[in-house]
């Protein structure tokens, strides 16, 4: 995990430097990348003490909307390729500066004090699983990936009936951490 973190930091620092040449920079990034980009921003500011990094986190679709309405953004990092493609088609990003430098993996989590035994996706159909945090599939990449995964396993209908739709992956994490849901789909 440390290697991946260092690789991400190195890649993003080089992208920050390319985008800003040691100047102030505004970053809009998927909520799932919050911790990584906070760390990257600290390293960038340590390297360039006179520069300021403004971080804006949210659902990838919401960030794209902000950009399309004129929000100033120097660096955009979506949680999915589809949103990056839309940004490119809308001329909101320069295709020559687009770099893929990180990848998310969909994981199912439960509260730390949970006694549920969830070892396979089909376990989500169990009666004792009442609520499952799922990003809104219409606007949140983790939700779209979750829906596709559950549809492929023929579980979407059963699990979506238990869904608590969230605005981003951080909200799903919070619901699980507080025990407000029995399980949640996030990135790992």
Task: Label each PLM-derived region with a short phrase.
Residues 1-3:
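N-terminal secretory signal peptides that target proteins for export/translocation
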Residues 6-17:
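Bacterial N-terminal signal peptides
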Residues 12, 22-48, 52-61, 65-69, ...:
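Exported/periplasmic ABC-transporter solute-binding proteins
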């Amino acid at each position: 995990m440390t290697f991946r973190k260092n690789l991400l930091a190195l890649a993003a620092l080089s992208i920050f430097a390319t985008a800003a040449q040691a100047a102030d920079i505004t970053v809009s990034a998927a909520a799932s990348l919050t911790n990584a980009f906070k760390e990257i921003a600290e390293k960038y500011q340590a390297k360039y003490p006179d520069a300021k990094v403004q971080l804006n986190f949210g659902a990838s679709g919401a960030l794209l909307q902000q950009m399309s309405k004129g929000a100033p953004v120097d660096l955009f990092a979506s949680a999915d390729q589809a949103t990056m493609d839309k940004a490119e088609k809308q001329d909101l990003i320069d295709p020559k500066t687009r770099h893929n430098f990180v990848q998310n993996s969909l994981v199912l989590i439960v509260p730390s004090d949970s006694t549920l035994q969830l070892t396979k996706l089909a376990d989500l159909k169990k009666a004792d699983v009442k609520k499952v945090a799922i990003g809104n599939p219409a606007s949140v990449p983790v939700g779209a990936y979750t829906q596709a995964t559950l549809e492929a396993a023929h579980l979407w209908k059963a699990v979506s009936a238990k869904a608590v739709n969230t605005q981003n992956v951080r909200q799903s994490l919070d619901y699980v951490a507080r025990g407000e849901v029995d399980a949640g789909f996030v990135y790992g």
